[in-house]
A protein has these predicted regions:
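Switch II (G3) loop of P-loop NTPases
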Residues: 48-50, 65-81
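Short, well-ordered alpha-helices that flank and scaffold nucleotide-derived cofactor binding pockets
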Residues: 31, 35, 39, 60-61, ...
């Protein structure tokens, strides 16, 4: 993970948690990533964009003063999803094992890579 912080620019690294399918662990991963980075001494902003509001993280300040901004998105795709992807440095796509999540995952990948062709993303199987 440390390579994410060696950008050579004075801008925050934006980590986007995204998947069209709800209930796959986006919010839990977002909370844990933010807390883990804070415990390591990084200044972290947290964007709770999910209207369900399930995140436990209390810092909602997103700006370039942070080393990292962690953005938790809702479990649906919208025009805003593309905007989030345009401004992201990496996207994390949590998925659950099984076939039900494949189509939403593929649609998510299509939306974020069309919005930001250079976006790196990781698919994390969560159960």
């Amino acid at each position: 993970m440390t390579m994410l912080f060696q950008k050579g620019e004075d801008m925050a690294t934006n980590i986007l948690l995204v998947n069209q399918k709800g209930g796959v662990g986006k919010t839990t991963f977002a909370d844990e990533i933010a807390w883990g980075l804070e415990r390591r001494g990084h200044k972290v902003g947290f964007g709770n964009l999910d209207p369900q509001g399930g995140a436990n993280h209390e810092k909602d300040l997103l700006d370039d003063e942070n080393a990292v901004n962690v953005i938790d998105t809702p479990g649906f795709l919208s025009d805003e999803t593309a905007t989030y992807a345009k401004n992201a440095d990496i996207a994390i796509i949590p998925v659950q094992p099984g076939t039900l999540g494949l189509k939403p995952m593929k649609r998510t990948i299509k939306v974020i890579t069309e919005a930001n062709p250079d976006l790196s993303f990781a698919i994390i199987v969560n159960n």
